[in-house]
């Protein structure tokens, strides 16, 4: 039987159906396909809806999506992963994601240790490949929570069962290190660096006190194989080398500052031949370190790897006397078709460079407002930079600090570093080296590697009492806030 529905009711029913579909959002399968097409797609709203309904797989994916964003709250991600794990009855791989988060966020390690210890007892580690690899991931972050004999057994099972994308090298390295077999561990770490980007920082840490000398030497040996390495690994190596060079530069600046202060008020004498030779040797070493960074980064840029392109563009913008506006703009133009949003952020920074004739405060502000309206995570930092540099008028450090603090409260680790630099190099009331050290340590402990150079510089210039006060303030921040 056919029912003739009046057009008005038909339109109303269609509108209701469309509204219901809109309210329902995407399914988990649709979200995964969206992320497959565009890893930076905005899907958190749909995932939150699914997670609120108790979908544990969506809860896990939401945590993973947030983990890729710089402004996400570590506390929220921890809660999502623990909810998805559901005491071992839910998504066991959530434990692996949580372990990776803790590995990137050092201050979480001790706080989460009791929970992780209990979680390991809530599922059989050798039940299937998924459980086995999850326990091995926890072993990477907490080697002491898995007995070496069990880790060796699980590693053997992993190697037997794994068919695709098998990467046992890092597990072997950590196991050998745990058992005190350092020569074997180093051999495995060197192999792991070639296949697993996470091994890069771990090998650097493994090298101990001489890491800033030994790791660059290792990368020089690796250069003949560089073209065959995964592009992510090349970029991570470049980023670590850049951090090492930044620390080297900061230590030289601190030495120069100390030397100037020690002769303040005294008759300024010309440098001795020994001083000139030492300064030349330091500058030559820094030039070599900078060239090494550029060689590695340029390979990743040539492959069209967006994070490397963004990193190089940021370097050019931060060093406008060494680069020109034309070559920087050309690089931003290459980023645009690959990642329009990040290109827009770079373009805003580009218009804030006062060394170039292309400086345009109005265009910079308009782009920042577009980014803020779209919910871009770094928009608040860009606006803070706009005020701290005084792009439109005189620098407004208080307004910049307020914006950076707001971003830090949201969980943006880079914001702590921005506050640290403003207190370290700012003028008048904003100049506060103790606060600078406090915030730089917070940033570093939250995983912001770029803060290491500022920490090292301040450690060489601040009195011991000031460092102790700064560390007490840092500890207080971690107790008071959910960082």
Where are these regions (language model features)?
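Bacterial N-terminal signal peptides that target proteins for export
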Residues: 2-10
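N-terminal leader/linker segments that initiate helical-solenoid repeat arrays
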Residues: 16-68, 133-134, 212, 231-233, ...
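Hydrophobic face of amphipathic alpha-helices that form TPR/SEL1-like repeat modules
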Residues: 30, 61-68, 95-105, 135-142, ...
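Residue-level detector of the short coil/turn that links helix A to helix B
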Residues: 38, 70-72, 106-107, 180, ...
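Alpha-helical repeat scaffolds
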Residues: 42-48, 74-85, 109-124, 148-162, ...
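Short helix-capping/linker turns of helical repeat alpha-solenoids
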Residues: 53-55, 69, 87-91, 122-131, ...
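Alpha-helical adaptor scaffolds
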Residues: 140, 349-355, 369, 376-414
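Terminal, low-structured helical/coil segments at or just beyond the last alpha-helical repeat
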Residues: 269-270, 450-483
